[in-house]
Structures are given as C-alpha cells and as structure tokens.
C-alpha cells in the first residue's frame, strides 16, 4: 500500500515551550491551509525525531518535545490528517526499539523513516540497531518503512539499492534545490527492478535564510559541486521577492515532476517550512501543487 500523500513536516517545539507552542503550530496549519486552498489536501504530517547534531548548527538545538507527545497534542487539532515520522535507530537496542515502534504504530503513525547516526559520526558507530537492519527486522511491525535518500551524495545508488533489498518501501529525499533527483532516479530505474515510493521533499526559503543560513547548513556536502550549486540557488531564493521566489520554486517543482513522473516510481510530496509554517510558505506550496499532486484516493 503506497502512502500516496502530501505530507507537511512539523518539527516538535522545544520541550520548555511544550503544549502551548504545539497547539499554536497545529492551529497555524489549519489556518494557512484554509487561506491557501490546501484545506483537505494535506494527508499527513511528518514529525522528525530530532537528535543533537554538530556544534556549528546555525540555530542551537535544544531538547525537543518527544514525537509521540507532540503527535498526541496536535492530532486532535488536525482532523483527517495522519502521522509519519522519523526514528533514530542507532542508539537503541532491539527490544527498546521494538517497544518504541510498537508505541508509534499504536498512536497511528502510518510510516516510519529509519535514521542512523548524525553526519559527525561514521555509519555503524551507534551502539544500537543500524537503519538497514531495522528495515528487515521490523517488516511485520511497520508496513511503511522509509529511508532517507540524498541524490547528490556519492555512492547513493548502491546505498539506496541495498536499503530497498533490505525492505525499504519508500525513500524520503533530502530537500531538493536542483533537479539532481531526476538523473538519479532515471539511472536507478535502468539498473534495478526496485520501484519504492519516493517522497519528493521541497522546502520554502524565507528571507531569514540570508541571515541565518540553516538550510545552507542542512544540505551542505563540502567538495560536492552539485550541492554548491544548490546552495547558490538557496541564496537566490532567500534574496528574492515573494512573486519571483514562488516562480523559482514552481519552475523547479515542474522540472522534477516532469522528469520523474514516467519512471514507474509511486510519488508523494513532502513539504517543509524549515523556519516554521507561514502564510507565504503555504501560498508557495499551493502554487506548486496546482501543477501536480498525488491523486486523491476515492
């Protein structure tokens, strides 16, 4: 069963802001959805399980509300919207992770992306379950098992193919600021029979990015020219006036959709407002989705 969805990423607030901030975020989603014509179109929220990363992160990472706690607060505010999440596996032993996944499923999480160690560590450094092992171990427990897909990363073809061999049913891309995913999936389709669902991720870039640089930091890959070009595009988006910014994002969206639509992969859309949901972000998302969106299930 594919997710066949438009998913909006909702990051849990800092633990010290708790319930009030969570409710405020959920109500903003309802408000901006109605104002932008996306009411009833969003089918999932995607809640990332956040872990502390590198010290040089532009916005300091504070302890976040747990995914389950956050979901329990926002779910009643978002009727008709289901849950997806990411789960770091690398620091939990098998029984602990099984309990966690059982709780996530019981809370109504329909899909879980298994995530490994942060990029400051090497693959396999965590003491817990590797994401690639989790894909096969929890096959029965989690029907929709996702992995992160970074089309610009060296060696990603082999990595993604192995994850599909292990039981991944979908790949959620890193934020796309170029059409590199088109070449990646075209090549992947030629060399393998795997056709997992692909959640194509698009992120709104507000003016604030020019000052803070969080998106630039999130997508960094030193020495990678394709990523350097993407970072330039992010800077251009951040410095553009709203109409031009919308046009640039819609043009990118069209290039990606046109390039991957006929390759045989089920497609879903994952939308992210990295600095928090806003009216302009929803307006941009609405224009993108007017061009193409996953078919509504009848």
Predicted features along the sequence, with ranges:
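N-terminal amphipathic alpha-helix/helix-capping segment at the start of soluble metabolic enzymes
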Residues: 1-11, 15-16, 20-23
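Conserved, mostly hydrophobic/aromatic
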Residues: 9, 45, 104, 163, ...
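Active-site pocket-lining/capping segments in soluble small-molecule metabolic enzymes
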Residues: 17-39, 113-120, 124-152, 187, ...
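Glycine-rich anion/phosphate-binding loops
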Residues: 20-28, 89-103
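Glycine-rich, positively charged N-terminal anion/phosphate-binding segment
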Residues: 23-32, 51-78
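Glycine-rich, proline-tolerant flexible connector loops at the mouths of alpha/beta enzymes
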Residues: 36-67, 117-126, 168-189, 270-279
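Ligand/cofactor pocket segment of small-molecule handling proteins
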Residues: 141-169, 173-178
